[in-house]
Amino acid sequence: MEEIAGIASGIEYADTAEESDEIIHVFEMLSELKEGENLILKAVGKLFRSFVDARRMSLSADEFNITYSSDSGSTNPILFERGLFLDICHAAMAATPTDLNLHRKRTIVCTGFNPAGKAKLPGTEDWKLFDDGYGRSKMIQIDPSLLKIRAGRMVHDYSIYSSESEHILWTQADMDTNGFFIMDGPLYPRQLMYWMGTNSEKVLIRHDKNAKKILQNYIDIMDFHLKNKMPVVGFVKNPAETQIMNLLRKKAKEEKIFAELPWATDTQMFKALLKPEKADTGKASAAEAGTGKAGTRFKITYTNWFLQLKQYYDDDIKTTSPLVEESLTHSFEPEDYTVAFFAVRVPYENSSVVFKIESLYGLIKDEEMRRRSTQKILYELSAGKIPETLLKADSIAKIGGDEKKEIQNLFTVDKSYNTFRWGDFDEL
């Protein structure tokens, strides 16, 4: 162990406290970032970095009388000995203030895949009601000809995205459109959309009816929010994209404009740009600006909103919105469905984390909607590290270990050496 520590301590690493002109230049480039003629990133409104004092923000009034959040719990893919992949996902919706009837509603989707086509799931793909109609479940079977690789991942994606989207659509009638809706994770089913937009001979879901139905569900969800002008955000807890950094690094090499770009991901870049001592470009109040270094542990720092294009599909797909399928129906202009986001850095257990907050360009292109959506998220993060209603939804939707073991006991699980060495663990 001493040798391991010695190797680690010998790695040269520097974290410059002072903000260099290069870092400032990086941020300024985010105002409009192109790859050739293609626009990749564009600031919506003014480019800025700012902060709020969490202590003051938590004492302010919430502009929204009710907040909704959705989440889906999963067994995660289970491989059984006769080649059957199975994943069961359980979706729920939470509200603050609490709405017990809404919390009681549940949607369960089970997806199966067997490459030999021998294992058939019971029943049909129609909904089966339970709990006096407050719950419903259905099964999806992926055709064996569609997948040569990524079977476990696809079984999971079908289950989690279907359960989430179907449950949101089912509970929209219970929503007060003057409220605020927080989705767990990105706005759209990113993994599924990638493969729907890729000409792959090994993952042939592009024209699969179930994949199309899932994507149509998400477009229908966004139509509801655009029609009612009801704010919706995707709260991405662990953003890991590299689209912006890849382009910046390419430009740095071609145009010789940066000596060094040390970040591996977009999140690392935003984390550096949002260090508390750097994130005051005039947006903070006079009282907040006077908090000084001693108050940095209470500072929540954030950027302006950005329009982010070309993040879902390969270059052979020309659209920049999720409307890759011509058969998808939608009520608004394609650009309105494009994802916009802002980054926010939050103090967290003697360190800090960066969250990505997504919304629809069709909503946040309105300045007042941008302001209200930003303020709502800052208020939620000042009151707790994760929005309260999102934590509620996570608790309601979670599938416990006992339930997972009960499912496993119905079949013979295919165990590898790692199963015996580490026990039951999740691997997608």
Positions of PLM-derived features:
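Long, contiguous domain-sized segments
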Residues: 2-54, 60-61, 66, 149-180, ...
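Generic enzyme active-site microenvironment
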Residues: 70, 91, 182
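Compact, glycine/acidic-enriched structural inserts
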Residues: 95-151, 155-156
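Two-metal-ion RNase H-like nuclease active-site motif
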Residues: 66-76
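Active-site cofactor/substrate anionic-group-binding motifs, chiefly glycine-
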Residues: 74-81, 86-109
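N-terminal functional modules and adjacent low-complexity/disordered segments of proteins
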Residues: 2, 90-92, 142
